[in-house]
């Protein structure tokens, strides 16, 4: 069974909640990553999305568990999939970002402050393809509906506060 997120990362792993973004960047990637950071930090949103992911992905991967590989965590799969869809990127670009972009790696929960090449978790292209393929269009649409509902609730709260 895949884990939601690695519960006890090493001492040098940068926490997702403290990831900093460039404030004046107009690229789409930081906006997507900020959204993912919000999903990770909001308990209610996090729980509902991971419940859905766990149900869909863990059921599909039963056959590969026999191979002895633990596979990526649900959070890593979600981040890779959202970035691929949101940037309309091919697998080669996602492979590059997952292994080289420090902010994306920090949101994935795998970036270390030590920056030693030996310590850095790396993903193979085939690993990314196999894991991202586990999220089908229906699951992504359901996740989208959950996130949009969350956004609507935030707007209602904001209107009540200022209205």
Question: Which residues does each PLM region occupy?
Answer:
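Charged, often Cys/His-bearing segments associated with DNA-binding zinc-finger transcription factors
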Residues: 1-51
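Basic, short loop/linker segments at the boundary and entry of helix-turn-helix/winged-helix-like folds
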Residues: 37-79
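Catalytic micro-motifs at enzyme active sites that drive phosphoryl/nucleotidyl and oxygen chemistry
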Residues: 66-69, 83, 109-117
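Non-catalytic DNA-binding core/recognition domains of DNA-processing enzymes
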Residues: 70, 76, 98-99, 121, ...
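Alpha-helical support elements that line or immediately flank enzyme active sites
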Residues: 78-88
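Helix-turn-helix DNA-binding elements, focusing on the entry/boundary residues of the two helices
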Residues: 91
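DNA-recognition alpha helix
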Residues: 94-110, 151
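Active-site- or DNA-interface-adjacent structural scaffold in DNA-acting proteins
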Residues: 111-163
């Amino acid at each position: 069974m895949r884990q939601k997120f690695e519960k006890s990362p090493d001492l040098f792993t940068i926490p997702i909640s403290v990831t900093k973004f460039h404030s004046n960047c107009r690229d789409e990637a930081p906006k997507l990553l900020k959204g993912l950071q919000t999903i990770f930090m909001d308990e209610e949103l996090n729980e509902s999305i991971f419940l859905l992911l766990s149900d869909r992905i863990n059921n599909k991967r039963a056959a590969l568990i026999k191979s002895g590989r633990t596979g990526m965590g649900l959070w890593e799969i979600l981040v890779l999939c959202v970035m691929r869809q949101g940037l309309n990127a091919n697998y080669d670009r996602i492979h590059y970002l997952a292994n080289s972009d420090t902010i994306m790696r920090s949101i994935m929960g795998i970036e270390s402050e030590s920056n030693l090449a030996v310590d850095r978790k790396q993903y193979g292209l085939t690993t990314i393809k196999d894991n991202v393929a586990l999220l089908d269009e229906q699951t992504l649409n359901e996740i989208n509906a959950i996130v949009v509902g969350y956004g609507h609730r935030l707007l209602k709260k904001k209107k009540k506060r200022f209205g």
